[in-house]
C-alpha cells in the first residue's frame, strides 16, 4: 500500500514538474488588459484569437457552450478555408467574437483590434482528454487520439509562449479561463 502511494505521489510530482506556470501579474497580461480596455473605450467589439494545439479541447469547448460563452460568439478556425484563414476573419464581426484555432503565428498575428492569447491545458487535462477521446470513439483518428503526438504539439506551442526564460504571450490553462479573463478585462 505504502509503495503504491509513493508511486502515485512520484507520478503527480513528475507531471507537475513537466507542466508550466504562469502569473497573470506578468506584464504580458497587463498589456492585454490595456488593449482590451482601449477597445472598449473606442466602442469596438471584443475580438479574441485563441491559439491552441491539437487535443487542447477546442471543439469540446465550442460544442459544450453551444458556440456562445459570456456573450461572445465562439468560432472554430477549422470551419474556415482559403487564403484568408487567419485572425483577420474576426474583423468581419461587429459583436464580441472569439476565434479558437491553431497556434501558428501568421502575418495577421498583430492586428490592432484583435487580442491574442494562448490556451495550453495541463498535462493532467491532456491525458484526461486523450483517455476520453479513446474511450468514446471506436475508430481513432491517429493524431488526435495519440498522447505522444498531442504532448509534442503542446510543447511546440509552449515554445512559442515562453522563449529565453521569459513569457512572450498571455497563456491560460483552459478556454474558459482565457475567455473569462478577456471578457472581464473588456467589461462584457
Question: At which residue positions do the language-model features occur?
Answer:
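N-terminal pre-Walker A segment at the start of P-loop NTPase domains
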Residues: 18-37
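The Walker A (P-loop) glycine that initiates the GxxxxGKT/S ATP-binding motif of P-loop NTPases
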Residues: 52
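Small-molecule kinase domains that catalyze NTP-dependent phosphoryl transfer to phosphate-bearing small molecules
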Residues: 136-188
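Conserved phosphate-donor/acceptor-positioning beta-strand/loop module used by diverse small-molecule
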Residues: 112-130
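Walker A (P-loop) phosphate-binding loop of P-loop NTPases
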Residues: 55
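Conserved substrate/cofactor phosphate-moiety recognition/catalytic segment
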Residues: 63-98
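Walker A/P-loop
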Residues: 59
Amino acid at each position: 500500500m505504502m509503495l503504491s502511494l509513493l508511486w502515485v505521489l512520484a507520478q503527480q510530482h513528475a507531471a507537475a514538474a513537466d507542466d508550466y506556470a504562469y502569473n497573470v501579474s506578468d506584464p504580458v497580461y497587463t498589456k492585454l488588459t490595456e488593449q482590451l480596455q482601449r477597445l472598449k473605450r473606442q466602442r469596438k467589439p471584443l475580438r479574441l484569437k485563441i491559439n491552441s494545439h491539437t487535443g487542447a479541447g477546442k471543439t469540446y469547448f465550442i460544442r459544450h457552450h453551444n458556440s456562445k460563452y459570456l456573450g461572445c460568439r465562439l468560432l472554430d478556425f477549422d470551419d474556415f478555408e482559403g487564403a484568408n484563414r487567419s485572425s483577420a476573419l474576426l474583423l468581419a464581426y461587429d459583436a464580441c467574437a472569439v476565434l479558437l484555432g491553431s497556434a501558428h503565428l501568421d502575418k495577421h498575428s498583430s492586428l490592432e483590434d484583435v487580442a491574442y492569447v494562448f490556451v495550453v491545458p495541463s498535462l493532467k487535462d491532456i491525458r484526461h482528454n486523450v483517455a476520453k477521446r479513446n474511450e468514446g470513439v471506436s475508430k481513432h483518428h491517429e493524431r488526435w487520439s495519440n498522447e505522444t503526438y498531442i504532448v509534442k504539439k503542446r510543447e511546440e506551442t509552449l515554445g512559442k509562449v515562453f522563449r529565453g526564460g521569459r513569457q512572450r504571450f498571455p497563456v491560460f490553462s483552459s478556454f474558459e479561463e482565457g475567455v473569462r479573463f478577456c471578457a472581464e478585462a473588456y467589461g462584457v
